[in-house]
């Protein structure tokens, strides 16, 4: 399938697994995540199991989350970082976060 998996690890609940897919351009990343989810469901089905990506399938069990790490580079440099700024956070990062919150 060509999905660049960086690693996996067990999580808090029995049968709960974390899958880390290597970063790529936006469209490739979306494709990798979609293919991975379909692949996991198909493999589970072939083994007589069901895989779910629900965030909370049982109120008495630990939930799951889906999150995406984001970065922004220009000419090989991380534009979110500014060594002189408080906490190393650049103005570009401030604007980027404001856009995420607004839209």
Predicted region positions:
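Glycine-rich, acidic/polar active-site loops that bind/position phosphate-bearing ligands
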Residues: 1-103
């Amino acid at each position: 399938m060509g999905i660049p998996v960086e690693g996996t690890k067990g999580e808090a609940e029995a049968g709960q697994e974390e899958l880390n897919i290597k970063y790529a351009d936006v469209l490739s990343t979306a494709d990798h995540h979609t293919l991975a989810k379909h692949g996991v469901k198909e493999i589970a089905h072939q083994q007589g199991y069901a895989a779910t990506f629900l965030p909370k399938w049982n109120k008495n069990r630990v939930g799951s989350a889906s999150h995406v790490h984001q970065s922004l580079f220009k000419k090989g440099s991380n534009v979110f970082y500014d060594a002189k700024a408080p906490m190393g956070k650049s103005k570009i990062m401030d604007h980027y976060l404001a856009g995420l919150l607004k839209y």
